[in-house]
């Protein structure tokens, strides 16, 4: 697998909205695997395709805390429900290195997506996993940490 270059702020591609993936072909599968390697090589817990210069709605993440690698790939992720309860996490971003900021987001979310095998799924995320998927979906929508306000971030 190939380690991909991570775009850094203020690269204008980071502010563009990503397009839906319509066909999960070998190129998309390779992108997902390369993104997972890149995320691990940079000690990240999540990575969105726009961060590696690909304007497709693809996210990889692994927020497991048991030392085992448990990557999750989400293609065309969409939040279909979010809790009223909010949590604060200190977030960082591979595209804005060395800066962290406390952000408020819904504590839990339900996300509809397609996996790398083309299977439609819906998963419930809470805690750091919920924060991570919301952060990565922000990237898909052209929003960067620290540069764009979020609805619950007040």
Question: Across the structure, where does each feature detected by a protein language model lie?
Answer:
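Positively charged
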Residues: 1-148
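A short, hydrophobic C-terminal helix/tail in secreted or cell-surface proteins
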Residues: 149-154
